[in-house]
Regions:
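N-terminal helix-rich module
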Residues: 2-6, 30-165
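Alpha-helical hydrophobic helix detector
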Residues: 18-33
Length: 165
């Protein structure tokens, strides 16, 4: 048997391996960035839904006991929303229940300066809005005069809420 020394090259070269590693790392970084953006959007939507549920409970309370509940909001990072007497800051330890942002990067960006609240008769409300924001975008909570509470996203679309008109 005659052995020939002209065997074909098998395997991958160092440059090919480096190109594959570079492509994998680029795809991983891109996926991680997308995942972080998705997590931020999810946190924003969850906080907006929590605020919506808090306001629905206040609306139910106003309707059940036929009384008025006037809302207030304190803007800024880790802002808060509540009713009755407005404290000086969100960190004051008064006994009144209020909604405080659970995430450190959440912000109460904008809210209606006029009186906003619920009135027990016929489940009516004084219309207004509260806007929550983080790095993923912003969601506006809208309170209509008929007592409907809805969410919409400002700017870019967010999962789980339609865009504001």
């Amino acid at each position: 048997m005659k052995k020939s020394n002209d065997s074909k090259q098998q395997g991958m070269s160092l440059i090919e391996i480096l190109v594959v590693i570079m492509l994998i790392s680029i795809c991983s970084l891109w996926g991680m960035h997308g995942w972080q953006g998705y997590q931020q959007a999810l946190r924003l939507e969850q906080n907006a839904q929590r605020l919506r549920l808090y306001l629905i409970s206040l609306q139910t309370q106003a309707n059940a006991y036929n009384r008025s509940i006037i809302l207030w909001a304190i803007g800024g990072i880790q802002g808060c929303v509540g009713y009755s007497l407005r404290p000086a800051s969100c960190t004051s330890s008064e006994g009144l229940p209020r909604f405080v942002m659970s995430e450190s990067d959440m912000e109460v960006l904008d809210f209606t300066e006029k009186v906003m609240g619920f009135y027990g008769i016929r489940n009516a409300a004084q219309a207004g809005h509260i806007t929550l924001m983080n790095s993923a975008g912003s969601i506006r909570l809208v309170l209509s005069a008929r007592g409907r509470i809805r969410l919409c996203s400002e700017g870019k679309p967010m999962p789980g809420s339609p865009q504001c008109l």
